[in-house]
């Protein structure tokens, strides 16, 4: 690789959550069949991680648990039939064919056709994964200073290695391998890496080229790209959705322009650049740069970036459909937690946004039509005719359109009471009481730090207003706000010391409440320390 410019390294820990679970069980992460999933959420739950050994059987890295169950059952039927045909299995005392025993190891399964394919289901332990991630980051900082590292996610980093190659007398490949080897020998977890002359090329080298390259004896894969090799190796690569920041929607719009590869995008940018700008607006610039293998952003620029506007949000998918009243309970709980989060992070807001997604089973067909537009639906819970929007879901089934509303406050605040009144007002206004609720999203937007509050506009009083009464009312409001503020801070201190479930409200104990369970989670998944919180 040309040593004249900057050199970046991207590292992605292989099946990180699953690898941690294997290491904790003293199992080989590369040969053990294991998925990380919470079976208490039913078999529809999405697997957070799947080991490479289980992926090799055709199981997706983001499969739902029931898909894993069905695929393994199918594989075992095929294995049993093949073992019987090969004479590896004899009939038992009941005259039936069955496996000798079960194995969770890929090598053992490959060596003995008489073994049943088994797999572990490991409940998520997010706190444990965070500890491993912190330990691995400390290893990276032995080679590269923290200011030259971007933590992209819990299991992925970017590093500007430019100024370390000469001092450590290593090539970029050698430096990346040294970092990965130490992580492997210290934690038992292997990784995939990409080296590139910019951040984009390092990412693509890792995501596309390295993950398709043969692994070494430790399961490590590494690839390098510069602008020239990128064009040689990847301009014809399909599908285009393998590239960073190219989703299915972008791919569909590119196909409409006759672009199916990055090479096609690069060619169109030369022949008819305006077509890309008409289709993608300002985002066309990023797409064109990436098509040519260009990326001007550096680690320093990423570190220095500050978003123009800030927001705090939370969302949850309910385990079962909730009616209007139980949905309102969930919104109250989420609002309480959001207000505490504002206080904790020292933000205030003037605007709240609430989005409610309904359950597909909310509707039944009252009178069939030729399509969704002229079909008459009724609410399945109440039988009332439904007149709202109906949209197809991913499978083409009719689904009620979501409800969305905005609540505005008359002042900057993090007061639970003020925010609660605004959010519940939105809920009561926009949510259809006949429908069943499945997903709730709540956001405080346009946040301002408490120490950066803009000057409030003066309040205009009428000529007939009683100024004394107005001042007394304002004083009472300030006193109530200050009292609530002290209570919020006390709650946060107690939660910090004794756990997030140390202070609860009566509503959290009602049937259907989810705060107690959510307080035991990290990022919406089990922390692994449920008994301690």
Residue spans for each PLM region:
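Short acidic, gly/pro-rich beta-turn/loop elements at beta-sheet edges
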Residues: 19-21, 203, 364-366, 450-452
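Contiguous hydrophobic segments
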Residues: 73-89, 324-332, 339, 435, ...
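Residues at or immediately flanking beta-strands
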Residues: 190-192, 353, 441
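DNA-contacting surface of Y-family translesion DNA polymerases
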Residues: 10, 242, 252-437, 452, ...
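Short, charged/polar surface micro-motifs in flexible loops or helix N-caps
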Residues: 14-16, 40-44, 359-363, 447-451
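Acidic, metal-coordinating catalytic segment for phosphate/diphosphate chemistry
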Residues: 20, 388-533
């Amino acid at each position: 690789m040309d040593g004249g410019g900057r050199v970046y390294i991207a590292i992605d820990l292989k099946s990180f959550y699953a690898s941690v679970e294997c290491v904790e069980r003293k199992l080989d992460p590369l040969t053990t069949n294991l998925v990380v999933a919470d079976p208490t959420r039913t078999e529809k739950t999405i697997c957070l991680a799947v080991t490479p050994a289980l992926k090799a059987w055709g199981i997706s890295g983001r499969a739902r648990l029931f898909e894993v169950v069905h695929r393994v059952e199918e594989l075992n039927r095929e294995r049993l039939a093949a073992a019987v045909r090969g004479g590896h299995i004899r009939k038992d005392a009941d005259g039936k064919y069955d496996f000798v025993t079960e194995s969770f190891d890929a090598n053992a399964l490959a060596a003995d056709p008489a073994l049943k394919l088994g797999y572990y289901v490991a409940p998520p332990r997010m706190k444990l994964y965070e500890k491993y991630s912190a330990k691995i980051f400390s290893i990276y900082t032995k080679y590269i200073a923290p200011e030259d590292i971007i933590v992209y996610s819990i299991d992925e980093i970017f590093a500007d290695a430019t100024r370390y190659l000469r001092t450590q007398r290593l090539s970029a490949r050698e430096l990346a391998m040294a970092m990965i080897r130490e992580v492997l020998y210290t934690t038992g977890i292997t990784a995939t890496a990409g080296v590139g002359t910019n951040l984009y090329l390092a990412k693509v080298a890792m995501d596309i080229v390295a993950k398709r390259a043969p692994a070494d004896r430790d399961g490590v894969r590494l690839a390098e790209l510069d602008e020239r090799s990128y064009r040689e190796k990847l301009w014809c690569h399909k599908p285009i959705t393998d590239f960073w920041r190219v989703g299915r929607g972008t791919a569909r719009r590119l196909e409409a322009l006759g672009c199916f590869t990055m090479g096609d995008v690069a060619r169109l940018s030369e022949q008819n650049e305006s077509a890309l700008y008409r289709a993608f607006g300002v985002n066309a610039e990023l797409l064109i740069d990436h098509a040519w293998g260009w990326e001007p952003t550096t680690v320093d620029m990423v570190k220095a970036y500050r978003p123009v506007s800030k927001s705090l949000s939370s969302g949850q998918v309910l385990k079962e459909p909730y009616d209007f009243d139980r949905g309102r309970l969930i919104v109250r709980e989420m609002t309480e937690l959001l207000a505490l989060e504002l206080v904790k992070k020292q933000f205030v807001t003037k605007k709240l946004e609430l989005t409610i997604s309904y359950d597909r089973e909310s509707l039944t067909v009252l009178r069939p039509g030729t399509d969704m537009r002229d079909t008459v639906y009724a609410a399945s819970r109440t039988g009332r005719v439904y007149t709202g929007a109906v949209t197809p879901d991913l499978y083409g089934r009719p689904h009620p359109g979501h409800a969305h509303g905005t609540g505005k406050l008359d002042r900057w605040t993090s007061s639970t009471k003020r925010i609660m009144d605004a959010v519940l007002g939105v809920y009561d206004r926009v949510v259809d009481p006949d429908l069943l609720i499945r997903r709730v999203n709540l956001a405080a937007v346009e946040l301002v730090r408490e120490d950066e509050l803009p000057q409030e506009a003066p309040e205009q009083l009428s000529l007939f207003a009683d100024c004394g009464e107005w001042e007394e009312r304002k004083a009472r409001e300030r006193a109530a706000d200050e009292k609530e503020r002290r209570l919020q801070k006390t709650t946060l201190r107690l939660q910090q010391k004794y756990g997030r479930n140390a202070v609860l409200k009566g509503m959290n104990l009602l049937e259907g409440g989810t705060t107690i369970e959510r307080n035991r989670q990290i990022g919406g998944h089990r922390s692994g320390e449920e008994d301690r919180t």
